[in-house]
Regions:
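A general "terminal functional-core" signal
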Residues: 1-109
Length: 109
């Protein structure tokens, strides 16, 4: 769902909820999360105003909405993030949400 530059956390979460409603209708058997942390407001390429803790909420909402269908079948891929501090904080929030669902399994390819 395209969002304009300057999108705030609140507007992003509202859009995410609409996307998740459609995802639940689809009933996916697994998820591939392509997590781009360059949406963090501290990122030099950011055009959104997301905070690091927003990535916890994004992950939690997504996992909660789809848990009955995916049953923990989730792949998370790091996509972007160019401010190292913001990247570390945002990725930590994302991983914390995965851990909370007991779905975190580390595997090296």
């Amino acid at each position: 769902m395209p969002l304009p530059a300057g999108t705030t956390s609140e507007k992003y979460m509202n859009a995410l909820d609409r996307v998740l409603d459609k995802l639940v209708e689809f009933k996916p058997e697994f998820l591939i999360l392509s997590m781009g942390f360059d949406a963090n407001i501290a990122d030099p390429l950011a055009q959104f105003e997301l905070k690091s803790e927003d990535f916890y909420e994004i992950t939690k909402r997504t996992l909660t909405a789809t848990k009955d269908f995916t049953q923990g079948k989730v792949i998370s891929i790091l996509e972007g993030g160019y401010d190292l501090n913001a990247l570390a904080e945002s990725a930590n929030e994302h991983v914390n949400a995965l851990i909370e669902f007991n779905w975190l399994i580390f595997s090296a390819l």
